[in-house]
Amino acid sequence: MPRSLKKGPFVDEHLLAKVDAQNEKGNKNVIKTWSRRSTILPDFIGHTFAVHDGRKHVPVFIDDSMVGHKLGEFAPTKTFKGHVKDDKKGRR
């Protein structure tokens, strides 16, 4: 069930403050964050976020098609190594 429109999108305050400060200065430095739950706003376009995936920070460059999604959607937490092929020789 989506979030109510009267509440607005959720964004951590510290993350919004960092983006606003960079927009005022005109900087586009990488912003390191653990806030995977924050919604991407139009103010974030053109910035690069280093989103934590539980092990490391994954760089995510924000473009206009990402607005409305969560930051965590673009930093996968699990690595899929493929299915193991059955070994018919070893089984008896």
UniProtKB/Swiss-Prot annotation:
Q: Which GO terms describe its molecular function?
A: rRNA binding; structural constituent of ribosome
State the InterPro entries in the record. Ribosomal_uS19, Ribosomal_uS19_bac-type, Ribosomal_uS19_CS, Ribosomal_uS19_SF
SUPFAM superfamilies reported for this sequence:
Ribosomal protein S19
List, in alphabetical order, the GO biological process terms annotated in this UniProt record.
ribosomal small subunit assembly; translation
What Pfam family does this protein match (any one)? Ribosomal_S19
Q: Which UniProt keywords apply?
A: Ribonucleoprotein, Ribosomal protein, RNA-binding, rRNA-binding
Gene3D superfamilies the UniProt entry points to: 30s Ribosomal Protein S19, Chain A (3.30.860.10)
| GO CC terms of this entry | cytoplasm; small ribosomal subunit
Q: What does this protein do?
A: Protein S19 forms a complex with S13 that binds strongly to the 16S ribosomal RNA.
Show the HAMAP family listed in the entry.
Ribosomal_uS19
Family named by the database record: Belongs to the universal ribosomal protein uS19 family.
Q: How is this protein named in the record?
A: Small ribosomal subunit protein uS19
Q: Which organism is it from?
A: Corynebacterium jeikeium (strain K411)
